[in-house]
Amino acid sequence: MQVSVLITLAVLGVMFVWTSAAELEERGSDQPAWLKSLERIFQSEERDCRALYGGCTKDEDCCKHLACRRTLPTYCAWDLTFP
């Protein structure tokens, strides 16, 4: 039974690589389709600044009067300044 499971997984892996190569050739692109779709998802969610409690890596990621708190998880919080 273990051998048949391994053979099945190997066949599925080969089929995945084969279909990915066929799709890549069909589109004429240098990136796999799944990578392009992930790239589109992340690009659509980019904003000029992060709102309150939004994820950040540095203070510039956050909107005005917010600062990046470096406790895990990092988030944008009020920097105690007034407009």
From Swiss-Prot:
<keyword id="KW-0732">Signal</keyword>
<keyword id="KW-0964">Secreted</keyword>
<feature type="propeptide">
    <location>
        <begin position="22"/>
        <end position="47"/>
    </location>
</feature>
<comment type="similarity">
    <text>Belongs to the neurotoxin 10 (Hwtx-1) family. 40 (Jztx-35) subfamily.</text>
</comment>
<feature type="disulfide bond">
    <location>
        <begin position="56"/>
        <end position="68"/>
    </location>
</feature>
<keyword id="KW-0872">Ion channel impairing toxin</keyword>
<keyword id="KW-0960">Knottin</keyword>
<dbReference type="InterPro" id="IPR011696">
    <property type="entry name" value="Huwentoxin-1"/>
</dbReference>
<feature type="disulfide bond">
    <location>
        <begin position="62"/>
        <end position="76"/>
    </location>
</feature>
<feature type="signal peptide">
    <location>
        <begin position="1"/>
        <end position="21"/>
    </location>
</feature>
<keyword id="KW-0800">Toxin</keyword>
<protein>
    <recommendedName>
        <fullName>U20-theraphotoxin-Cg1a 2</fullName>
    </recommendedName>
</protein>
<dbReference type="Pfam" id="PF07740">
    <property type="entry name" value="Toxin_12"/>
</dbReference>
<feature type="disulfide bond">
    <location>
        <begin position="49"/>
        <end position="63"/>
    </location>
</feature>
<keyword id="KW-1015">Disulfide bond</keyword>
<dbReference type="GO" id="GO:0005576">
    <property type="term" value="C:extracellular region"/>
</dbReference>
<dbReference type="GO" id="GO:0090729">
    <property type="term" value="F:toxin activity"/>
</dbReference>
<dbReference type="GO" id="GO:0008200">
    <property type="term" value="F:ion channel inhibitor activity"/>
</dbReference>
<comment type="function">
    <text>Probable ion channel inhibitor.</text>
</comment>
